[in-house]
């Protein structure tokens, strides 16, 4: 307030002075409220993540029992994107048989489009405002049925297709990893012709030196950066003895997708992380995003800085999806 206002107040009757004081108090309160609102709005707009996705293997039993109810829950939580897991109607017979062999141990059998055709599944996702952006697909299917993969992917609006892991028999030696790098280049080219990007999700093996070479880096260095991309799982990367941030910085624009989860305490594979038994051993140490020891905010910052486009929460077969997945999303919305 300027001098003119002060001089006027000094000669006003008491009632007018009181009104003036009320005005000042009200104006201060209103201004403070607007400032607070502005700060909150800026905070909301400056959050590191806006469209957070979910890998559906986080709640496979729920999806198996009630697909529509599960998708509605996911949507109401605030998730926007999805990553699917197979097999699918277009999957190869080999992929389907391998899945059928393990479903008794898993306790569920639903996958892919959950008995819907691709068109109806897309309509169901649209109904709940969800977009499928990525899909894990069996290696054999990608090698033998890429045109069918491409047709389904275009119907769904997928951008990325890739494998969840390299079959164990194909990665026993460095030569095996080199052959996989060559195979990935071929798959990347096939995917590109279908308007897609091929991604490789590493499950934590191949992150330690073998004969003076790190297999994961061998694959990164021997694949075409225009054709082959990667999906980092920050839990399995850490369990394999590697630093997620170091890989993101060292290989900018190679990682298109990332799985976000947390680790209740720092743990590593009992051996080399090469088989499902070693993965299962570490599941008890998986926790909600933000509830563990991983530097989630810094990882997300470096991921965005270095080209990651899709961020998927994944909490493998978590016991209480409604609580766990909501907690992870709430944390990520506020970093």
Give names to the regions the model predicted.
Residues 59-66, 86-94, 109-116, 138-146, ...:
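Acidic-and-aromatic substrate-binding clefts and catalytic sites of carbohydrate-active enzymes
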Residues 22-42:
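N-terminal export signals
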Residues 47, 71-76, 91-101, 113-132, ...:
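Acidic (Asp/Glu)-rich catalytic clusters
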Residues 191-289, 293:
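Acidic/histidine-rich catalytic cores of soluble enzymes
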Residues 1-22:
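N-terminal secretory signal peptides
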Residues 27-29, 33, 128-229, 322:
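Active-site acidic/histidine proton-transfer and metal-coordination neighborhood
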Residues 10, 16, 38-73:
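C-terminal segment of N-terminal export signals and the immediately downstream linker at the start
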Residues 50-55, 82-84, 132-137, 161-163, ...:
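Hydrophobic faces of well-ordered beta-strands that scaffold small-molecule active sites
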